[in-house]
């Protein structure tokens, strides 16, 4: 009888230890699935953004995936233009952000632009384009009689345009925020900023051969 009782107790305890204690996620609120007609209508609406008030966002920190607040999939469908303040996501290092970004672009029609703060003098940024401080001090702020733009304008402009062509995104977001005295005196400020936008406008923007590519300027003086 004692042996039988011990055998029963052993079986009971073995049953408890064999229970699956791994935590399992519960899908308490499944994501709502919209129809293809919904997305087609959404893209058609996004195409009218030049005719109405629009929704523009700067977005960064999308190297995180634990919260929808840090993911492209978490952005509202109503966003017309997303400025990639966190940079262009690497498809190898950050495949989720890359995938969701392009799903947002292609499925929802949300346009993607690359932002940059326009400061060529700050931290000797001009040196990245093979220019010297003397170049910035002495080069003209206007087009020469032959229609040639100054070197700083061409080199910096082409550097920014490269992202548009290489990544296949929708344009540039230029943040005009000249802060240092050097930037205001020798950098891209005032008439030089006007010239810079004019140069870029030959390639992207409403007066260019690529009017679907956006040339956005925001900031302060």
Question: Model regions: which residues?
Answer:
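Intrinsically disordered, low-complexity Ser/Thr/Pro-rich tracts
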Residues: 2-3, 218
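Chitinase-like catalytic core of GlcNAc-active glycosidases
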Residues: 49-221
């Amino acid at each position: 009888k004692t042996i039988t009782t011990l055998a029963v107790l052993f079986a009971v305890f073995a049953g408890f230890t064999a229970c699956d204690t791994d935590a399992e996620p519960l899908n308490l609120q499944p994501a709502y699935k919209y129809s293809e007609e919904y997305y087609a209508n959404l893209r058609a609406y996004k195409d009218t953004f030049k005719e109405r008030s629009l929704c523009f966002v700067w977005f960064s920190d999308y190297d995180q995936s634990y919260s929808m607040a840090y993911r492209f999939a978490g952005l509202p469908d109503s966003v017309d233009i997303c400025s990639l303040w966190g940079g262009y996501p690497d498809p190898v290092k950050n495949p989720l952000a890359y995938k969701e970004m392009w799903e947002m672009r292609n499925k929802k029609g949300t346009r993607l632009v690359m932002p940059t703060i326009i400061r060529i003098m700050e931290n000797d940024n001009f040196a990245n384009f093979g220019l010297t401080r003397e170049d910035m001090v002495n080069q003209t702020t206007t087009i020469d009689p032959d229609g040639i733009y100054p070197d700083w304008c061409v080199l910096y402009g082409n550097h920014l345009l490269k992202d548009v062509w290489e990544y296949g995104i929708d344009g540039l977001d230029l943040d005009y925020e000249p802060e240092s005295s050097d930037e205001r005196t020798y950098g891209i400020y005032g008439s030089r900023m006007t010239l810079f936008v004019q140069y870029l406008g030959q390639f992207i923007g409403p007066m260019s051969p690529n009017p679907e590519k956006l040339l956005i300027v925001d900031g302060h003086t």
